């Protein structure tokens, strides 16, 4: 995969109008299920961790520390696009497992889509306090 391919993959997981975090969150109405808050925080923290590791081995700037999920999703699409192609094979260790930059970013896209599905499933559950 090229940096452009990875950028597109992340953009689709984050922003596609039908199946993405953005699409799932657009279905949330009223008082959201508390698990949705946990999932969005988890996605934010995980994306920040992945990209901090990528920054350490590629020399790119790390993600903005004050970015919430929406801003971080837009940031990572552009960051992936700007990666030098040769950096995609750089090795990263995450949770004791070796990944290349490219494989870690593919993991990030899968992880994002997985949790987008959970958010979508919870979006229709209205909480009455």
Where are the model-predicted features located?
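Aromatic-glycine hotspot motif
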Residues: 1-129
